[in-house]
Curated annotation (Swiss-Prot):
Gene name of this polypeptide: APN1
Propeptide segments, given as residue ranges: 998-1020
Topology relative to the membrane: Lipid-anchor; GPI-anchor
Covalent lipid adducts (GPI-anchor amidated aspartate), residues: D997
Positions of the record's site feature: Transition state stabilizer: Y452
pH dependence (UniProt free text): Optimum pH is 6-7.5.
Record-given protein name: Aminopeptidase N
EC number: 3.4.11.2
Length: 1020
């Protein structure tokens, strides 16, 4: 039985994340439409080359290098004295190149380097012969296009030449190019290292080069550095030579042909762990945190070797991993030397969470997959970056699942990749998978959710269509054919096609290329509409492009592989029954009885949504109420996600979607609850702070009551599976947010026991929920304990979690004091934060709930503090904070606070920014009275009324429990219920998030969404 929650003052803004860590071909679907078995065309038309294909966009080709010369080999030498924090470096590079068209100009890339000298020689006997000096060359730079032009004293006829250049530069401080990083040693000394991040266009910051992915060459690298430091690069060390009294030059073996963006080198005092040809480098005080990364790397490389049939050591003799303290991305797949941010490689069982371990494992799998997809075969141009990132995203879960069978890693793919991709790809502004770019900014923008998650989803769909054996054979053919070269999408299709010729895998006359072009050249994705004729058994299916927030007529046509199950034949695990929709609509003949449900897209392997007529939705809903496990868990998750987004787009009555979600009262598995978390978080964010919010909490309470009662939230068992841990975190977060006394008391007790020394440290796997909700009622001593724990920790993932937890406090004075530490003020000593951690403090406070938002507003109202805020954290951080405040503004009182803040900030907020902030906030206020808001409110009111009828009569005295303290009130007509695991409390909702990163390049979000503090009882 559900408890009736009557709530007045509630506050939380929830943030969903996943994570983490963004030339077009004018090709149509097919020349002549093939006949597809099992479906008759209802559209009356034929898919053509023009229908639905995204138009080619104009790009500035002046950013591309001329094709008059191409590189063959680079002989690169660099000298750095980073051991004493010297930021200048010097270098020389000898570039063997082929002139293919007579010219006197050799044009390459350069960003910020200063040339000292340059000369050109001919190589009449090829690259192995002695050079013949032609003379010194003139050079000029173009900072707009980042080109450097070397002009020869004579015309260079087609042939082989050597360009030798001396240069100098400065190590960057923005985690890009050749840059400086640092860490604090155990003795308190700050130690420096020099490292690289060249993808996508930053090799040109370290040496002049042909910095395009298709222009592959071999490299020999040598680096002069301190004797106390070690240099590593893509290839094994060949030899060393000591020079001067304290310097050494390390020489490396010659690389295979590779793209410039894959070159890497690190100069540091790091230590290593070794297993065969694999090594993991870490700062000395993190040495014991490298064990899992080494173990996982060995396992994952072995399964990829076997799966792809091309052993890694065919081309590369070693594979190193290194954790860099300052690293902008999640990781970088440099061939033979993979670089990571520390949180994506280091694992400490004493403090790291199950999510942290999963992030490490998936990131390693992602980067190891790149050793084939991106390194062995690189995209000819950034237009095809999905050939790298799509495969890496697929295999970060698939390879990990093969390496650790039975650990349930593959179960994460649907929620963290497919459903997340659809949420992003349903926007009108999305792009096709194939998409041209020219400028560095445009190229960087291609590393988005289309390149990663959508592409991984589409490739997973094709893997299921072709079958695993054909898939592996096709990939081996593709990789073998294009090894050490660039590739375009059509070459992948040819490789896959070669594996299925004559096998009848696809309909007669249909090719892999014809299918894939509709998915790679088309923006967005389809919704498959299913309408049943219950009298005849026939089913009409049709397709249209899906938009998240609207229903727009369109002519888009995809070749959609579909299958279906029904109640009497629920064979969800069979994938040899695909049929195809290649037109706008078709009729399917079935014998499914009218009283049985039908579900399309088994296990959601197809990258599309499915909508049904309302009666079929009703049949599905009723079936799940009777037996929640009668439909496969991944399809239950799909149904929840589809119903939610279909309702938001206007394709499905919102009440139908919400009625369907009521089956969650009985749901016991991770995947459906994670899908539901997305929908519930959206509704929570919209309704928080409104009069309708208490009805929403009644609804959520009804859904989670039973599952919460079955879970243990204050202890971790060795038998707990990965998915069980995800489920516990999701449900316990909602339960504590809903004010479940049991949840709040347990989290508070665990934190208090640890802080006072009367109990053990909280287990890492439940720490984020425990610390956050324990912090709601924490005293100053407990707040200070957690703050000191954060400051003393050297594990960056743990520090981030603790920062987020401190932001959960309900005490505005605590929060404002916490903010001052991010500015380095208020203590008289330097605060040991990294730059990104200072920004994280701000994020944690405004994400912690309405109390945190109000604390931030009050803080920024102080002119002296806002000046220091901008000086320390930058104007962009201020703007991000203002945007967060506006997005968390849901009522008139909160709007007044926002307006007062904008006024107080004066010229720091320009008129356009102020208008945008007010527009965002007003849209939140208007939503509740719009169509979607009214539909939701109506359903929730009816649900609450029905719930009230089944609720026991209230006693005169109501006990409201928040954490470990109890307040008793006696209103004239108080209402409570006492069934279930808790008595009535008031609260705000926080939801869990998925940390992606899987994709390894994907940027990172907050692990927990935090709630407000004030507890009130609605007085009758």
């Amino acid at each position: 039985m559900v408890r009736l929650l009557l709530l007045v003052s509630l506050g939380l803004c929830c943030l969903l994340a996943s994570a983490d860590r963004p030339p077009y071909k004018s090709s149509g679907i097919y020349e002549e439409e093939p006949q597809l078995p099992g479906a008759s065309d209802l559209s009356g038309g034929v898919a053509s080359d023009e229908i639905g294909v995204a138009p080619a966009q104009a790009v500035d080709e002046r950013y591309r290098l001329p094709t008059t010369s191409i590189p063959i080999h680079y002989d690169l030498h660099l000298r750095t004295e980073i051991h004493r924090n010297e930021r200048t470096f010097t270098g020389t590079v000898g570039i063997q190149l082929q002139v293919v068209q007579a010219t006197d100009k050799l044009v390459m890339h350069n960003r910020g380097l200063v040339m000292s000298s340059a000369k050109v020689s001919s190589l009449p006997n090829g690259v192995t012969g002695a050079p013949t000096l032609i003379g010194d060359v003139q050079y000029s730079t173009d900072t707009t296009f980042e080109h450097i032009t070397f002009t020869s004293p004579t015309i260079l006829q087609p042939g082989t030449y050597l360009l030798e250049v001396a240069f100098q530069g400065r190590l960057a401080t923005n985690d890009d190019g050749f840059y400086v990083s640092s860490y604090v040693a155990d003795n308190g000394e700050r130690r420096y290292l020099a490292t690289t991040q060249f993808e996508s266009t930053s090799a040109r910051m370290a040496f002049p080069c042909y910095d395009e992915p298709g222009l592959k060459a071999t490299f020999t690298v040598s680096i002069t550095h301190s004797l106390s430091y070690k240099a590593i690069s893509n290839m094994p060390q060949k030899t060393t030579t000591d020079i001067e009294t304290d310097m050494r030059t390390t020489f490396f073996e010659k690389t295979p042909a590779m793209s410039t963006y894959l070159l890497a080198f690190v100069v540091s005092d790091f230590q290593l762990r070794l297993s065969g040809a694999q090594r993991v480098y870490v700062r000395p005080n993190a040495f014991n945190e490298a064990t899992f990364a080494l173990e996982a790397g060995v396992k994952i490389l072995k399964v990829l070797d076997d799966h792809l049939g091309i052993p890694y050591d065919t081309y590369m003799p070693k594979l190193d991993q290194i954790a860099i303290p300052d690293f902008a991305a999640g990781a970088m797949e440099n061939w033979g030397l993979v670089t990571y941010r520390e949180q994506a490689l280091l694992f400490n069982p004493a403090v790291s969470t199950y999510r942290g371990k999963t992030n490490v494992a998936t990131t390693i799998a992602h980067e190891y997959a790149h050793q084939w997809f991106g390194n062995l075969v690189s995209p000819e141009w950034w237009e095809y970056i999905w050939l790298n990132e799509g495969f890496a995203t697929l295999y970060e879960f698939y390879a990990l699942d093969m390496a650790y069978p039975g650990q349930e890693y593959w179960e994460l793919f649907n929620q963290q990749v497919i459903q997340y991709a659809m949420g992003q790809d349903g926007q009108a502004s999305t792009r096709p998978m194939n998409w041209n770019a020219a400028t560095p900014g445009e190229i960087s923008a291609l590393f988005d959710r289309v390149a990663y998650d959508k592409s991984g989803s589409v490739l997973n769909m094709m893997r299921h269509v072709l079958g695993d054996d054909n898939w592996k054979a096709g990939l081996k053919a593709y990789l073998t054919d294009r090894a050490l070269q660039g590739a375009v999408d059509e070459q992948l299709y040819a490789g896959l096609q070669s594996a299925i010729e004559g096998k009848g895998v696809l309909p007669n006359g249909v090719t892999v290329a014809q299918i894939m072009r509709t998915w790679t050249n088309e923006a967005g994705y389809p919704v498959l509409n299913v309408r049943r004729s219950y009298d005849t058994g026939d089913v009409i299916i049709s397709q249209e492009r899906f938009y998240n927030d609207r229903k727009v007529p369109n002519t888009n046509i995809w070749m959609i592989p579909y299958n279906y199950v029904h109640q009497a034949k629920a064979d969800f695990n069979e994938f040899d029954d695909f049929q195809w929709l290649a037109t706008k609509a078709a009729r399917i003949e079935t014998t499914v009885p009218a009283n049985e449900w039908i579900v399309f897209n088994k296990q959601q392997v197809g990258y599309y949504r499915v909508n049904y007529d309302e009666h079929n939705w009703e049949l599905i809903t009723n079936a799940l109420h009777e037996n929640w496990a009668s439909i496969h868990r991944l399809n239950r998750a799909q149904l929840i996600d589809d119903a939610y987004w279909l309702a938001r787009s206007g394709r499905l009555d919102l009440r139908v979607a919400l009625r369907f979600m009521t089956y969650l009262r009985n749901e016991r598995e991770y995947a459906p609850w994670t899908a539901a978390n997305v929908a519930l978080t959206y509704f929570n964010n919209r309704l928080r702070g409104t009069a309708e919010y208490h009805n929403f909490l009644i609804f959520v309470d009804a859904l989670i009551e039973d599952i919460y009662s079955l879970l243990t939230i204050d202890a971790v068992s060795p038998d707990d599976t990965l998915l069980h841990k995800y489920l516990v975190q999701t449900i316990s977060t909602w339960a504590c947010s809903m004010g479940y006394t049991d949840c709040l008391m347990k989290t508070a007790a665990l934190l208090k026991a640890e802080a006072s020394g009367t109990g053990p440290a909280v287990h890492p796997d439940i720490a984020s929920v425990t610390y956050c909700y324990g912090m709601r009622s924490a005293l100053e001593s407990e707040f200070q304990y957690l703050y000191r724990k954060m400051m003393n920790s050297k594990n960056l993932a743990e520090r981030t979690m603790l920062i987020d937890s401190l932001g959960c406090s309900n005490n505005k004075e605590f929060l404002k004091a916490f903010l001052t530490t991010a500015l380095g003020s208020g203590t008289g000593v330097e605060i040991n934060y990294r730059a990104d951690e200072r920004r994280r403090v701000v994020q944690a406070i405004y994400s912690g709930g309405r109390t945190g938002v109000d604390a931030l507003i009050e803080f920024l109202m102080d002119p002296a503090l806002v000046n220091e805020f901008v000086s320390t954290l930058s104007t962009s951080t201020l703007n991000s904070a203002l945007s967060a405040i506006a997005s968390r503004t849901n009522n008139v009182e909160e709007m007044n606070k926002l307006n007062a803040l904008i006024t107080a900030l004066g010229s720091r907020v320009n008129s356009q920014t102020a208008a945008n902030l007010r527009t965002t906030a007003q849209a939140n206020l208007d939503w509740v009275n719009g169509f979607e808001g009214l539909m939701l409110s109506n359903f929730l009111a009816e649900f609450a009324a029905e719930t009230l009828l089944t609720t026991t009569a209230a006693p005169e005295t109501t006990t409201v429990t928040a954490g470990p303290t109890t307040t008793t009130t006696t209103p004239s007509s108080a209402v409570t219920t006492t069934t279930g695991p808790t008595s009535v409390t008031t609260t705000v909702v926080q939801t869990t998030t998925e940390e992606d990163d899987g994709a390894a390049t994907i940027g990172l979000s907050i692990a927990a969404l935090l709630v407000s503090i004030t507890v009130h009882l609605l007085m009758g």
